[in-house]
Each structure stands twice: as C-alpha cells, then as structure tokens.
Amino acid sequence: LDWALYKNFVEEVDITAQVVNTTLSSDDIAYFSPKMKDWHLTLTDVNADVSGPVADMSGSLRSVRTGADTKLSVDFAAQGLPDVGKGHFKADISELTTSAADVDRLAAALTGKNLPDEVLRIAKNAGKIGLTGKFDGTLTAFAADAALATEIGGATCLLQVSSLRDGCRGVLGDVKTSSLQLGELLENDLLGPLSLNVHVNGELSSEHSDAEVSGEILRLGINGYDYESL
C-alpha cells in the first residue's frame, strides 16, 4: 500500500467497492476530499457497485435515498469530481423520485445556491416528482432525454444545451405535455389541463434570451372550457 498516494486521493486512489444496505456521509468523505466539506449530505439504503478514483468514477447505484423523499437508481460515469461545476457526467436514470424541498437542499449543498423562489414555488405545486431519462455532459452544456411525472401531470423532453460565444448558450429542444394541470402548477384558477408539443431553438445568456418557438397546443382549459388544436 503506497500511503503517498493518499496525498492526492481524488486523482490517484482507485476505489473498487460493492456497497450493500449502507449509510454514507459526505462529511466522512470530505476528510480525504476537502471540497466536499460543505455538502453535509447523508445517503441511506445505498446499494451500489463503484470503481475508479473520485475524479474518474463509474458504477451502478441500484438504490440510494437522501432527504425525506428522494430515491435514485442510476448507472453513471463522472469525471472531474469533486468540482461539480466543471465535472462531466453520464447517467442513465431508471428511477428518480424527489420533492421540491429535497431538490432545494441538494442544490444548496452541491452548488452553494438555493433554487430561485419562483422555481421553488412551482416545484412545490407539482408535488412528488418522478423522472426517468439519460444525461450526458456538464451542468452547463449537455444532452438530456427525460420523462417527467408529477401529481398534476407529466411531460417528456429532449434537450441539448451547448456553449456558444461570450457566455451564451444554445438551447435546442422538444417538449410534450399530457394533461398537465397548469392552473395548479401556476396557482391560476382560470387555467385547466394543458397538452402540447413544442420545439424550441434559441440562445440564452445572463443578459438576454432569444428563441424561436413552434408547436401545437392539443388541449388547453381556460375558465372551465377546453380548447383543442390551437
């Protein structure tokens, strides 16, 4: 055993492990990886196979729980940890269930920022959230394919986000909803169920947004009436 490698634990020490019905704390791992010291996350019911160093890890999480409502099953590969902001991730999510409160707490732990108030409010209105899908990229440039299920309706999304010039990001995507209870989501009594197909092609930055949006509203409830093929 070469103890000198532990001075560069994140890049040099290979981890090969099978975890069964285990509880893990980021505070313990932070002893070897100080960048995780502010995460303060506890994972329970962990069943996983993991291999590689922290900076280039892959594996299968058959189950893991955190917070009050979050459960995850996923095959994954991650490069660049523990620097989440610069890391590259691949994930094939077979099950993810969570809630607004858990997402807010995870966002604060991993990025140092809570969700914006409006986003948090809308997420709470959705109730319990379920997700399956695939992700490949960084947190700011990625391709994703997801199916979302909530207590007030569902949606599917194909999304590609790319880095352009001067901090701009290109956004290309297709979104479909089926009987999404829009009024409950936005707290607007005039709105009812929404089913639509939308294609988006645009650019986003901290200073401006510009997008072409096309699609079809298959169904929209307004003031108690359902309108179709708008």
Please tell me what each predicted stretch does:
Residues 6-13, 103-111:
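Acidic Ser/Thr/Pro-rich low-complexity disordered segments
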Residues 171:
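Short beta-strand/loop motifs in extracellular/secreted proteins, especially
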Residues 21-27, 67-69, 97-101, 141-143, ...:
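Gram-negative outer-membrane beta-barrel proteins
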Residues 90, 100-103, 112, 168, ...:
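Intrinsically disordered, low-complexity regions
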Residues 17-21, 100-105, 133-146, 175-178:
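Charged, low-complexity, helix/coiled-coil-prone segments
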Residues 1-17, 34-36, 43-54, 61-65, ...:
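Extended lipid/amphipathic-ligand handling interfaces
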Residues 27-28, 102-105, 118, 229:
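Exposed alpha-helical structural elements
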Residues 25-30, 39-41, 52-57, 109-115, ...:
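Flexible, solvent-exposed coil segments and beta strand-coil junctions
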